[in-house]
């Protein structure tokens, strides 16, 4: 498998990447990695998925990006050969010791510390690493004073101790050891706000920490007032020999506990200049005396309070004021503390994107300074998890039901930090390089042609521009991604619990997305923008698309689904708050949304989330819509059963546990026995124990569109191929034909069973229809599918599609403000996904020229309008 470094990324630090293997080619976890000159590079490998025959489908690999450079080749090797270990883990009664060259760190088995006793070159660097959480309790009361009503808001904030309930060594290899810590925070004996922290310790001494916060508490009173990791560091030397640095969007900020300014006695100005350069000022009795008469700045904090502002502050006394010395727009999230012997640096991923965050150091002149990486910084307004109103609005504002369930209990968010303990002084350029490795890590991939040839993630097309219409379609696919990338910045879709998600529907009259309107605000995977972006990335290898897709998957896998409790594995439908809608469904949280990120990058947190989604089938019992009065369950063949199939198929390929395959095959067999297969129902009785679907007859007055537009076609076709199920593939084709036919034709071909059933616009089902046309060899049907799909975006008088903009105002400086007034994420995601898949299934029937397409549309105008127009 040939690998290349993704565009716009640098070959620095460690790379974790996925290998994809054709069925039957690789059996063992034994691989070799060669650089571009054919030299073998140290490699650590794991199997992440297998084919049904037991051969390797996906593998996870860790290697030095610096050594691999722009690319190389990954290949199977003889199973007897092993890598020479650069890192060793020794298990002892009271914990583990990890060593790599001159680096050493302890992982204690008991106590409050995650990590301890970190040394480099024989020098102690970090004494402790602990989770830190601050919880605020807010209450509002009305009081009467002198005849006046006064609203009194009281907020009490406490720092809660973290209790580690379990510690485990997940993996230990020649280059990396991964430890997992699960715990809770205690408030007066009550368990609050669980955490899961992974420490990935690399062979060069890099320590990467993925910290997941879970909400467990009372959303009416519990506010998040601070969350992060605190490092007990070790510094030596005089205060004027110590050094603090922050990375900013300008020059690196340098400071010291004691600055060598002194007005009563002339000091060599070169001393201050040397301090600023990070050079060690030699200790001297005279300087010690002078330092006693200078302020001692012991506390520093860089705070990113929004996506548009940061400040650097410091204070000399606990009860003294903060002084603000520098401000800017976007800090990249880097801090370092140094003395004459050592540097400990901290780098944070998505620092300003996931604001409010901070990097703080306390007691900088003391023996044990504390450095805290705040993922939610304490000076920000405590985060409020309450809903926006006391009722729901299912009729007026597109919210799901008339009952409330805006519950954040069980949702999560994950942040990443890296720590670099180094002997001596780490130069500014090295700090920036460290930050780049964390913010924009090296990603290694195969070419799109390789994934396409071996059908990774199902059916999708490679870009083609050999005809007028194909070239136009590719421009539209590019423009759609560009537009959403621009909207993230333009609309400031940033913040700890928001970053990565898109809004659902645009309101042209306000020139805003419907951020405050019920089910029209945050999208929460509605109509699978995840599938659109990941398939667009696979076919292009575009870094800008990868950035959108990765952020979307990281957000939706954590914030938009439940990770414990009675709704575990379910996700919340689109709403103004990510957890606000009463609809909790498996379609929002299914594993298929995130499989590409997991397999391409080996991200373990995404693996956790996909495992959590397995609980969705059982959790349906907690939801009134799925649970009937007698306690039995009902599901629709799509998007409910299709989402469960996504979860089960992912679990099966990761574990080869036959239970999950049997669940899928049971449902396929049950559907096969119905009069119309996937078109029957669409509601069935459901048994979460064995996956059994009970046919309960045909329904009228319902719509089938949700069966098709939530990834159903992609899930079923990939599952059919993985399991070799011709029955499922045929049912998809038959269903696609019913979606293609008009009402009278459907009634006739179904012998009246589908009378009164709505199937919706082709925007929902074009790829399923394309599968039907391909399987039946019906070229006329294929041409008509293209006419309908392309005609939803193209017209002779408006061929610009996603490239079009309308000016609605101007800034004071005359800069035009523009938008796409008809845009919606539903339409964008669906049109792009359908075009990508249909171009693979029925490529030859796509019209070649605009003249041909326009003539077809004039001859037979579409009955559907542009979605959202």
Regions found by a protein language model. Give the residues of each.
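Conserved beta-strand->loop/alpha-helix structural units within folded catalytic cores of enzymes
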Residues: 209-210, 407-419, 523-549, 587-607, ...
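Surface-exposed beta-strand/loop patches in extracellular or lumenal glycoproteins
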Residues: 5-29, 220-234
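Terminal, non-catalytic domain-edge segments
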Residues: 427-449, 650, 654-662, 666-670, ...
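Substrate-binding groove/exosite segments of carbohydrate-active enzymes
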Residues: 333-335, 377-380, 386, 390-396, ...
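Beta-strand/loop-rich accessory regions of lumenal/periplasmic or secreted enzymes
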Residues: 96-425, 430-446, 499-505, 521-524, ...
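Solvent-exposed beta-strand/loop surfaces of large extracellular or lumenal domains
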Residues: 34-58, 385-396
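Intrinsically disordered, low-complexity Pro/Gly/Ser/Thr-rich segments with frequent PxxP/GP/PP motifs
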Residues: 58-79, 401
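Glycine- and aromatic-rich loop/turn segments at beta-sheet edges
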Residues: 1-4, 452, 481-518, 559-580, ...
């Amino acid at each position: 498998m040939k690998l290349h470094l993704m565009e716009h990324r640098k070959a620095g630090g460690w790379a974790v990447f996925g290998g994809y293997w054709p069925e039957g080619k690789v059996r063992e976890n034994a691989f070799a990695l060669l650089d571009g000159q054919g030299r073998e590079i140290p490699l650590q490998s794991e199997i992440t998925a297998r084919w049904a025959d037991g051969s390797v489908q996906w593998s996870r690999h860790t290697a030095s990006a610096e050594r691999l450079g722009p690319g190389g080749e990954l290949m199977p090797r003889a199973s007897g050969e092993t890598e020479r270990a650069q890192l060793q883990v020794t298990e002892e009664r009271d914990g583990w010791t990890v060593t790599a060259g001159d680096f050493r760190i302890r992982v204690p088995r008991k106590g409050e510390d995650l990590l301890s006793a970190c040394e480099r070159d024989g020098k102690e660097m970090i004494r402790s690493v602990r989770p830190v959480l601050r919880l605020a309790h807010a209450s509002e009361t009305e009081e009467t004073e002198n005849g006046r009503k006064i609203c009194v808001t009281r907020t009490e904030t406490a720092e809660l101790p973290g209790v580690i309930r379990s510690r485990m060594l997940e993996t230990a290899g020649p280059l990396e050891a991964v430890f997992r810590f699960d715990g809770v925070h205690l408030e007066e004996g009550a368990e609050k706000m669980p955490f899961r922290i992974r420490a990935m310790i690399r062979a060069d001494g890099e320590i990467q920490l993925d910290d997941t916060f879970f909400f467990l508490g009372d959303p009416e009173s519990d506010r998040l007032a601070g969350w992060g990791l605190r490092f007990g560091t070790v510094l030596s030397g005089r205060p004027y020999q110590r050094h603090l640095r922050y990375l900013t969007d300008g020059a690196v900020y340098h400071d010291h506990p004691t600055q060598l300014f002194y007005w009563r006695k002339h000091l060599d100005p070169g001393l201050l200049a040397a301090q600023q350069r990070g050079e060690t000022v030699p200790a001297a009795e005279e300087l010690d005396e002078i330092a006693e008469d200078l302020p001692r700045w012991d506390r520093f904090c860089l705070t990113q309070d929004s996506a548009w502002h940061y400040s650097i502050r410091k204070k000399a006394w606990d009860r003294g004021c903060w002084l603000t010395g520098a401000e800017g727009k976007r800090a990249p999230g880097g801090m370092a503390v140094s003395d004459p012997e050592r540097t400990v640096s901290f780098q944070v991923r998505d620092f300003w994107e996931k604001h409010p965050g901070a990097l703080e150091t306390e007691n900088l002149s003391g023996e044990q300074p504390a450095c805290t990486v705040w993922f939610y910084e304490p000076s920000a307004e405590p985060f409020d998890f309450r809903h926006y109103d006391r009722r729901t609005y299912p009729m007026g504002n597109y919210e799901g039901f008339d009952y409330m369930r805006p519950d954040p209990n069980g949702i999560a968010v994950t942040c990443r930090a890296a720590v670099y303990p180094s002997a001596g002084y780490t130069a500014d350029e090295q700090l920036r390089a460290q930050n780049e490795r964390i913010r924009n890590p090296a990603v290694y991939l195969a070419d799109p042609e390789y994934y396409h040839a071996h059908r990774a993630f199902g059916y999708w097309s490679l870009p083609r521009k050999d005809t007028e219409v194909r070239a136009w379609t590719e421009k539209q696919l590019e423009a759609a991604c560009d537009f959403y990338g621009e909207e993230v910045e333009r609309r400031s879709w940033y913040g700890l619990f928001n970053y990565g998600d898109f809004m659902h529907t645009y309101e042209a009259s306000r020139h805003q997305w419907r951020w405050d309107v019920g089910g029209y605000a945050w999208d929460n995977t509605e109509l699978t923008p995840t599938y659109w972006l990941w398939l667009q990335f696979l076919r292009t290898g575009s870094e800008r698309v990868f950035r959108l897709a990765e952020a979307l998957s990281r957000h939706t896998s954590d914030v938009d689904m439940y990770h414990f409790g009675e709704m575990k594995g379910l996700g919340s439908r689109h709403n103004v708050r990510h957890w606000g809608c009463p609809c909790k469904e498996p379609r929002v949280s299914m594993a298929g949304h995130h499989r590409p990120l997991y397999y391409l990058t080996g991200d373990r947190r995404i693996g956790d989330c996909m495992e959590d989604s397995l609980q969705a089938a059982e959790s349906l019992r907690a939801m009134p819509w799925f649970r009937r009065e007698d306690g039995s369950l009902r599901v629709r063949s799509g998007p409910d059963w299709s989402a469960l199939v996504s979860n089960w198929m992912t679990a099966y390929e990761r574990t080869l546990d036959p239970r999950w395959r049997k669940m899928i095959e049971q449902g396929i067999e049950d559907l096969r026995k119905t009069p119309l297969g996937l078109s029957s129902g669409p509601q069935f009785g459901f048994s979460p124990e064995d996956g059994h679907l009970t046919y309960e007859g045909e329904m009228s007055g319902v719509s089938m569109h949700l069966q098709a537009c939530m990834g159903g076609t992609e899930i079923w076709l990939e599952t059919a191929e993985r399991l070799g199920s011709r029955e499922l593939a045929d049912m998809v084709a038959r269903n696609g034909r019913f979606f293609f036919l008009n009402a009278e034709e459907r009634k006739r071909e179904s012998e009246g069973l589908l009378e009164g059933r709505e199937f919706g616009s082709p925007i929902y089902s074009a790829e399923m229809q394309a599968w039907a046309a391909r399987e039946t060899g019906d070229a006329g049907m294929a041409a008509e599918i293209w006419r309908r799909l392309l005609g939803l975006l193209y017209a002779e008088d408006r061929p610009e599609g996603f490239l079009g903009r309308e000016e609605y105002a101007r800034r004071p400086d005359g800069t035009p403000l523009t938008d796409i007034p008809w845009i919606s994420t539903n339409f964008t995601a669906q049109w792009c996904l359908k075009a990508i898949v249909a171009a693979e299934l029925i490529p030859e029937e796509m019209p070649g020229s605009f003249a041909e397409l326009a003539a077809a549309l004039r001859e037979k105008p579409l009955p559907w309008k542009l979605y959202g127009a």
